[in-house]
Amino acid sequence: MEYLPLFAQLKQRPVLVVGGGEVALRKIALLRRAGACVSVVAKKLHPELAALEQEGALRWLAQSFEPAQLDAVFLVIAATSDAALNRRVFDEANARQRLVNVVDDQPLCSFIFPSIVDRSPLIVAISSSGNAPVLARLLREKIESLLPASLGRMAEVAGGFRDRIKARIPTTDGRRRFWEKAFRGRFASLMAAGDTRAAEAVLEAELDAPQGPQGEIILVGAGPGDAGLLTLRGLQVMQQADVVLYDHLVSDGVLDLVRRDADRICVGKRAGAHAVAQHETNQMLIDFAREGKTVVRLKGGDPFIFGRGGEELEAAKAAGVPFQVVPGVTAASGATAYAGIPLTHRDYAQSAVFVTGHYKPDSEPFDWALLAKSRQTLAIYMGTMKAAEISQQLIAHGRDATTPVAVISRGTREDQRVLTGTLDTLNILAKDAPMPALLVVGEVVQLHQQLAWFQHSTDAENLRSSVVNLA
C-alpha cells in the first residue's frame, strides 16, 4: 500500500495555497467545503478567487512566496505553472514537516487528493496512488450511481441515535445487528423517500419493542426498453430487491440489472392476454411484503401511465402495506425521442395527448372530436389492434386523412423499427408491426427522416413503401 487513506479534519485549520489560477481555484473549492481557513499567495487572482476574497471567504497574500508563510499552517498546496517555485514550496514544507501537495506532480507530494463521492457525513475516497487518475474518476462515477443522495442524511440520523442505542444495547454484536436491520429495512426506505420523521419513529419503535422484518412494495418504472434509460433510483432499488414481479414489456437488459439472488416472477400482460390476473398480482405483492421482503414491481415505461400501477398501490394501501414509487421514462417520450419525432414543435404541435387504445369495455368512449384537433400530437399506447377504428374515427371527426403517422415498434431497443405513413394507412402500418408498438399521429412525424439519429432506426420511406405494397 503506497498511501495510507486518512481523512483530515480541516475545520478552522489554516491552509496555504501557492498560486491564484484556475487549478488553485479547484483545490480551494474543495478546501472550503471541508471548512478550511484558506490563505492564497499570488501576485494576481483568478476572478472567482478575487470575488471570494472580497466576500471574506479567503485571505489573499498579494506577494511572492516566502518560507515564513509556512510557519503557522496545517498543510500546503502548490498550484503554479512555475516548476522551480513548486519545487521550492515542496522543499520548504518538507523541512517544516508540513503536509504538502504539488498539483499534478506526484513525486513532490506528501499527500494526494483522491476522487471523492460526497454523501456527507458519509465520504467515499478512491485513489490509484497517482498511477491512473482517469480510472479512479471512472470508478467514482460508478459508485456515484449506486449510492443514493439520502445516505448522508441517513448517516446523520443514525449518528443522533448512537448514544441511546449504545445505552440500550450493551453488546457490540447486538448493536451491529440493530444497525444492519435498520440500514436494510424500513428505516432506510423512509430516509430514501425523504420522510425523516417516520424513519426516526421506526428506530424509536425498534428500540422500545423489536419487530420482525418489515417488508414493502416499490413500484419501479423500467423505461421503454433501453437499459440506459433506467433511472439511478430505479437501479438502486432493484439492487435491494428480494423479489421482483415484472411484465413482458421489461427488456432483458433491464432485468439483467436486478440483484442476482432476487426471486424473479413474470406476471406479464399483453393487450387482451394476462399471464397472471391483476387481482392475483396485487395479492402476491401484498403477501411477499408481509413476509418482510422488499418487493419490486417492475413495469415497462412509467408505472402511472397506462401501467395499472395506481390499482396495485390502492390494494397495498388497503392492506396496510407500505410502498414507494420510482417513476420511469414513458414510451411516448422515449420511443419518439429515439425515432427523431419531437412530441411538440412550435411549427407543428402545441400540445401532446397520451391515449390508450386498450380501454375497459364499459368505459366512456373517447372524445374523438377533441382527439381529432389539428396542431397536436397523439401518442397512442396499445393501439395496434384498434388502428383501423382509430384511423376511421379521427378522419370522421375532422382530422385530415393525409396527417403524418408513425408506428414505432420496440422503441429504444436494438431492433427498433419506425414505420411512417398517413392517417388513412395507419391500419396497414400497424397490422404487422412487432410488439410493443406506439402509434404517433401528428404533423411532427414528418421530422422523422430529418431528425432520426438512433443507429437502428429504419429508413422510414422504404419501410412505408414495402408495407403499403404488401397490402
Curated annotation (Swiss-Prot):
Keyword Oxidoreductase belongs to the record? yes
Residues bound to S-adenosyl-L-methionine are 224, 300-302, 305, 330-331, 382, 411
Q: Tell me one GO molecular function of this protein.
A: NAD binding
Q: Where is this region: Uroporphyrinogen-III C-methyltransferase?
A: 215-471
Annotated stretches, region: Precorrin-2 dehydrogenase /sirohydrochlorin ferrochelatase = 1-203
Belongs to which family?
A: In the N-terminal section; belongs to the precorrin-2 dehydrogenase / sirohydrochlorin ferrochelatase family. In the C-terminal section; belongs to the precorrin methyltransferase family.
This protein is called Siroheme synthase 1
Source species: Cronobacter sakazakii (strain ATCC BAA-894)
- Which gene does this sequence derive from? cysG1
